[in-house]
A protein has these predicted regions:
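Nucleotide-sugar donor-binding/catalytic module of glycosyltransferases
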Residues: 1-112
């Protein structure tokens, strides 16, 4: 039986191949490691799929989705696929500092 991660990090993306690797790397570099990454690729026409497939980490999963780039719909798809106790969002052209999830986990622990 697998234990659910504390966090599901949902990354909706649409034609962000140039930024996506750095976004995913910033999550994989977290000091807090109880997370999964759910990437929702909204019918990208660039190399987004190739960037995602280059990650060989069991915490990274991808969902192919197509609704003409509506980010809210992609987030909802990611939420439904999430296994974590908490869902966090990261846009595919952003990054997190290394302690992001550790600090959020600490706040949750102190004030559930």
């Amino acid at each position: 039986m697998t234990v659910a991660p504390l966090f599901s990090v949902v990354i909706p993306t649409y034609n962000q191949a140039g930024y996506l690797k750095e976004a995913i790397d910033s999550v994989l570099a977290q000091s807090f490691t109880e997370f999964e990454i759910v990437i929702v690729n909204n019918h990208s026409t660039d190399n987004t799929r190739g960037v995602i497939e280059a990650f060989n980490d069991p915490r990274v999963t991808a969902i192919e989705f197509s609704n003409k780039g509506v980010i809210g719909a992609s987030r909802n798809v990611g939420i439904r696929a999430s296994k974590g106790d908490y869902v966090c969002f990261l846009d595919s052209d952003d990054t997190w500092y290394q302690e992001k999830l550790a600090e959020v986990a600490q706040v949750i622990q102190e004030d559930p």
